[in-house]
Amino acid sequence: MTSRREFVAKGFGTALVAAVTPPIRAQEPRSAHGQSRAGAPKSGRTTGKTALRWEVFVTPSIPVITSDLAPGEKERPWPPISSTVIYGERDAVLVDAFITVEQSRALANWVAASGKNLTTICATHGHGDHFFGVSTVLERFPDARFVARPDVVAIMRQQASPESLATFWNPRFPGQISSHLVIAEELTGDVIDLEGHDVVIVPLGFTDTDNTTCLHVPSIGLIVAGDAAYNGVHLRLVESNQQGKRQEWIAALDKMESLKPRAVVAGHKRIGNEDSPRIIAESRKYIRDFERLAMTTTTAQELYDQMLKLYPGWLNRGALWSSARAIKT
């Protein structure tokens, strides 16, 4: 099996540059398992259409300015973030963006190197680390639409509020976030047309926050999961501090699994990991392990330590520490 190609932004506090260029035109049509091959249309709607392709751009961890550190840790990096481009013969749809101006310029350069016409940018959910950089991308692609479901837009407005920026985002990333944030327009309906193929926005409800979605491309078996699934990165369960919320997240994972995807791209993933559908089951197991250990431990430290024993190699221990404290304090 041919290993799939992943494009990684290089740099740590310096200008970010795509590691491989050009990112898209050189790539053969690939299956959702990562093999390079033509994708066969699955419905009459797509017969005769150019098969869609997709690529993932991952920006590495960047340092966060905070004193809120996990036990034994000297720093708290923000985990890698992924952005996915889905494209046909001419046009492309970009799913999610990044936090900082530098990250987002690298993303825009990567998309521009493809020569594709970026028609649409879609946000899977309202967390700022997946849309603050859209304004920077739009400087390069001013004709692209930035869209999301109305309930996602409501969360975006909260994240981009002066209070949220002043108390959370800007102190953690001083001078790095655009001062001209844009909010998505509310999308009417749940389907984006890409050269005759459906890109379906699937409402998932609560996952790591309220009103989340994933994007499903039936013709190529792809799900872009946003933060509904993680890949080698500790899940952010801070907002899931009640059992009912964690069960809602599991139900969302079940819903994605019912679509029978052949590839699933997580919003936060360890660089180099495959975009395998097994990350749905892995994310579900993580939540269930957290749930089980939450009932058998008494302190945040104990819960944190027990989860680390199960997931020693996963990134972003700071998120695990915050999750443990959210239900033990």
Predicted regions and their residues:
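Zn-dependent metallo-beta-lactamase
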Residues: R4-R90
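Metallo-beta-lactamase
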Residues: P41, A92, I99, V153-G205, T209-D210, S219, ...
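Conserved beta-strand hairpin/beta-sheet module of binuclear metal-dependent hydrolase folds
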Residues: V56-A113, N117, C214-G226
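Short catalytic-loop micro-motif centered on adjacent basic/acidic residues
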Residues: V93-D96, T119-A123, V200-I201
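Active-site metal-binding motif and surrounding structural segment of the metallo-beta-lactamase
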Residues: E102-A148
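Extracytoplasmic/secreted proteins, especially bacterial periplasmic and envelope-associated proteins
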Residues: A106, F132, T136, E248-A251, ...
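Accessory terminal helices/loops
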Residues: S258-A263, R270-T329
